[in-house]
């Protein structure tokens, strides 16, 4: 689940607690990754497989062993939040579709006064598209197939991935976790 604003709070209230590190600092180490965070980011760019491949190659370059952890079932305490997110995504998708129609109409007219409006609509469309992205079963299957081909390890959490990621690091089976 994560704690919203935790990094900001730590930075504001402590000194020298958060340290920036590079990939080279983790050479030869194992890192667990909350897969959904990066899948969402990569789906936003439309080239999710290519971006995931680039990420894996970067790990390989630095001889880092990544272990991707996929979310399992939704915890009871988060079901209301998930339903609210679904509603927001659906609303964003509908607004995106309306903007697409408006965009097409503006493109058809060759009025130069529309240029600013077109740019504004394109930005809104991009924002609405990003906020309507949903990880589908086919995305997960494609990614897992890619991991199998490249020998990348992955686990399926019973619940949320970040809980299993934290346990793996806490138990000393990985040195770090990539998450939000």
Where are these regions (language model features)?
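Active-site and ligand/interface coordination hotspots across diverse enzymes
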Residues: 23
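Noncatalytic, basic helical substrate-engagement surface that gates or grips nucleic-acid strands
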Residues: 2-17, 26-160, 164-168
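Acidic, metal-binding active-site segment of PIN/NYN-like and related structure-specific nucleases
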Residues: 165-180
């Amino acid at each position: 689940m994560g704690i919203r604003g935790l990094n900001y709070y730590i930075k504001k209230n402590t000194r020298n607690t958060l340290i920036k590190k590079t990939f080279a600092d983790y050479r030869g180490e194992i890192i667990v990754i909350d897969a959904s965070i990066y899948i969402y980011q990569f789906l936003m760019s439309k080239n999710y497989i290519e971006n995931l491949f680039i990420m894996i190659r970067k790990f390989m370059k630095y001889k880092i062993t990544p272990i991707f952890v996929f979310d399992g079932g939704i915890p009871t305490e988060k079901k209301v939040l998930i339903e609210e997110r679904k509603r927001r995504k659906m609303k964003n998708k509908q607004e995106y579709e309306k903007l697409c129609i408006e965009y097409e109409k503006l493109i058809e007219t060759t009025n130069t006064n529309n240029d600013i409006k077109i740019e504004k609509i394109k930005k809104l469309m991009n924002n609405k598209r990003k906020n309507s992205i949903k990880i589908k079963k086919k995305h997960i299957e494609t990614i897992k197939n890619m991991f199998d081909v490249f020998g990348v390890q992955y686990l399926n959490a019973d619940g949320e991935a970040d809980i299993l990621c934290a346990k793996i690091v806490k138990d000393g089976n990985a040195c770090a976790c990539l998450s939000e």
